[in-house]
Amino acid sequence: MNAAIEHVQAVAFDLDGTLCDSVPDLAAAAEAMLEQLGMKPLPAKVVESYVGDGIGKLVHRVLTNDRDREADSELWEKGFVSYMKYYRDHLSVFTRPYPETEAGLALLKSLGIPLAVITNKNEILAAELLKQLGLADYFSLILGGDSLPEKKPSPLPLRHAAEVLGIDVANMVMVGDSRNDIIAAKAAGCLSVGVTFGYGDMTLLSQDDATRPDWIIGSLPEIYENLQPQKNKEE
């Protein structure tokens, strides 16, 4: 166990690829958008590789089938409107929490630790998705990619979350599946926890100091298992 875990006062989570598997609905929205624009569909695995930087960036990547290129502005605008319209209406058709998500959240909540969601997804969509999945009540704070002037990998959302929760950011844990989560956590000065069941490749990310998480877990209850002895000691 990382020594820093002894000082944890709040836990923040990424959403897509950490709390839930949302790719099926994200991919369905991409397929609907491409069909409306008269373009060929992309495999769900390709769409999965494009997730993590917000829907605006996802639309660019899907339209160009390239992680780094941007689509023509007029095409992007049409695509974005189409994507958002479909996705808003189909947020949780196939999206489900990962098997041990709710158990892990309930265990952490039992310790009296405030929980937050820090995602690059639009805040309204994130809040509605959590509500539809029955997870919203676990969280004291939900921050989306459009909640603040900067999003992950900027440390700003993490620092803001800590401020709202009334704790030092060094006493917060950021749990996620992507480089954005880990880079943001390191820049903010808090503990980074990588999950092995999401969309990011933790083995690959761990090879680089900049994206190596402080701790890797295979299920959310593992966080509780490490925090619970500490909380018992404090009592």
Curated annotation (Swiss-Prot):
Pathway: Organic acid metabolism; glycolate biosynthesis; glycolate from 2-phosphoglycolate: step 1/1
Cofactor names: Mg(2+)
Active site as annotated: 14 (nucleophile)
Gene Ontology CC entries for this record: cytosol
GO MF term (any one): phosphoglycolate phosphatase activity
Cited InterPro entries: HAD-like_hydrolase_sf, HAD-like_sf, HAD-SF_hydro_IA, HAD_sf, PGP-like_dom2, PGPase_prok
Enzyme superclass (EC): hydrolase
Reactions catalysed: 2-phosphoglycolate + H2O = glycolate + phosphate
Residues that, per the record, bind Mg(2+): 14, 16, 177
Enzyme Commission number(s) from the entry: 3.1.3.18
Gene Ontology terms: biological process: carbohydrate metabolic process; DNA repair; glycolate biosynthetic process
Pfam family for this entry, one: Hydrolase
Alphabetically ordered keywords of this record: Carbohydrate metabolism, Hydrolase, Magnesium, Metal-binding
Keyword Membrane: no
The family this protein is said to belong to: Belongs to the HAD-like hydrolase superfamily. CbbY/CbbZ/Gph/YieH family.
Function, in words: Specifically catalyzes the dephosphorylation of 2-phosphoglycolate. Is involved in the dissimilation of the intracellular 2-phosphoglycolate formed during the DNA repair of 3'-phosphoglycolate ends, a major class of DNA lesions induced by oxidative stress.
The protein, known as: Phosphoglycolate phosphatase
Taxonomic placement: Bacteria, Pseudomonadati, Pseudomonadota, Betaproteobacteria, Neisseriales
